[in-house]
Amino acid sequence: MVNQALKIANISKEQVDAVAFTRGPGLMGSLLVGTSFAKSFALALNVPLIDVNHMQGHIMAHFIDEGQEMPEFPFICLTVSGGHTQIVVVKEHFNMEVIGETIDDAAGEAFDKSAKILGLQYPGGPLIDKYAKQGNPTAFKFTKPRVKDLEFSFSGLKSNILQLIQREQKKDVDFIEKNLIDLCA
């Protein structure tokens, strides 16, 4: 994979100035593998090793492209992914403060788990979005999370969907198929 990445970048190993890796947050197994490889690769090349915060990387990646206008600090950013949902005050490039986040499942995780309940393929978020555009958002009522301040909670929505499906499939085994777009909306 490294050779392929170097080929795409049109550089040789000797032209690598530093090795960057994600130190977290994230899944422990992936972080350990990435960290171990990055340390070994940097050591072999005798170049500096740079650790990067995963969520800071997501936020600042939007400003990497040449010609892209740099942001005016401070700004507020909503980061939503499979594993994280956060509101972040970005004070400077490496000075960020999380002011709100999920207390349970991240939004992306809730989408993927709900999609699985509905029998949709992974990743489920894009499929739910596609079907939701065609559906009736008022066809089904789900409870709203009770959270404080700038917190998020998505586990209740996932549980509501599961309970609704289990209850309605007892009456009609084709319930999901007949109501998919409205369930997604």
Tell what function each PLM region has.
Residues 77-79, 85-89:
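Short beta-strand scaffold segments in enzyme catalytic cores
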Residues 38-58, 102:
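Short, acidic/small-residue loops that bind anionic groups at enzyme active sites
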Residues 2-17, 167-171:
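Phosphate/pyrophosphate-binding loops at sites that engage ATP/ADP/AMP, CoA/4′-phosphopantetheine
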Residues 18-20, 30, 70, 75-79:
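Short glycine-aspartate micro-motif
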Residues 91-134, 158-169:
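Glycine-rich phosphate-binding loop plus the immediately following alpha-helix
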Residues 21-45, 65:
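Short Gly/Thr/Asp-enriched flexible loops that form oxyanion-binding sites at enzyme active sites
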Residues 129-185:
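A contiguous, well-structured pocket-lining segment that forms one wall/lid of small-molecule binding clefts
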Residues 52-75:
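Conserved phosphate-binding catalytic cores of ATP/NTP-utilizing and phosphoryl-transfer enzymes
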